Amino acid sequence: NYLVQFPVKYYNLEEILTYGAFSYPVAFLITDLANRRYGKIIARKIVYIGFILGLVLTLCFSTDFSNLISKRIAVGSGTAFLIAQLLDVQVFDKLREKVWYVAPLVSSLIGSFIDTFLFFSIAFYGTGVNWITLSFGDLLVKIFVALVMLIPFRLLIYSVQEIGATKKIN
């Protein structure tokens, strides 16, 4: 995640939060909507497309790849995104028959935890960066945004349903 390189410099948050924390919950929302409407096979395809797009953007716009941390950020970001998103798709699919908010919330929370742990441990373990503190700040924002994303999920799910799904959303 390119945005993880930029700490939030407001309200003394630069030690505990990067802008990367705000982008992944949106990715989970998109995947969950696709999963609800089209099923897990299409949702997985969207994850793979997002992974390839992220890889291309990282190669084109990343900072300094001669820097070991930049390489670790790229590897950590790609690995975390792919594993967390695929897990999100699987968990969502298993919980899809529950009340409407259970699948997107639980899958996003599990995916966010996995994404955060994998990314920060791969990108920053052993580098001297205070990655544990950053990861907690990142995870707290992801949890908050996952809760907020239930609002657009609920609103958008009606649009998704109108496209042609016949199954009622609880």
Identify what each model region corresponds to.
Residues 5, 16-17, 55-78:
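Interfacial aromatic-anchored transmembrane helix boundaries in multi-pass membrane proteins
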Residues 30-34, 59-67, 86-91:
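Membrane-helix exit/interface motif
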Residues 41-52, 99-105:
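Cytoplasmic-side transmembrane-helix entry/capping segments in multi-pass membrane proteins
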Residues 30-33, 37, 45, 52, ...:
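Long, contiguous secondary-structure blocks with strong helical propensity
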Residues 17-18, 47-48, 108:
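Juxtamembrane helix-loop boundaries in multi-pass membrane proteins
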Residues 1-38:
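Hydrophobic transmembrane alpha-helices
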Residues 71-169:
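Membrane-embedded alpha-helical hairpins and interfacial helices in multi-pass inner-membrane proteins
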Residues 1-5, 57-65, 119, 123, ...:
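Structural signal for membrane-spanning alpha-helices in multi-pass inner-membrane proteins
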